[in-house]
């Protein structure tokens, strides 16, 4: 399907909708009533979206991408997932002070059609509209979700410093 850019009209920090508010804005603006993929624009990854999508279709639940992460201090900057032996999410906590596992959740989500109305519910209940991980934290307490485990690379390039760091990593690989 073609990709389209949707402008929410925000011109300042004070009027921004937040990531979850922007997702709801896109749902309303485009009349989305189907399964949906949400990928943060500041993610750079090398895993296969096709494999992830095939997993999503086979498992028939909402899914998140997770990867084991070695640096427990850095893990505090991510969503952290706890899963059972079948890959079912038991809990997700966004940016925990004390991570309960070493599984980082990356902002690449696949949602089933029946989940789409829950974005509006989440916002109406007054929940945090910022990071999309807060929605996952809320959602996994209401319905079954699965974790897609990957081992390839995934980086957050949302700051000039992290973009420069990742650029150096990829430049070194080309040599």
Briefly describe each language-model feature range.
Residues 1-83:
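Conserved beta-loop-beta/alpha segment of the NTase-like Rossmann-fold superfamily
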Residues 44, 53-57, 88-156, 160-175:
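Catalytic-core segments of class I nucleotidyltransferases/pyrophosphorylases
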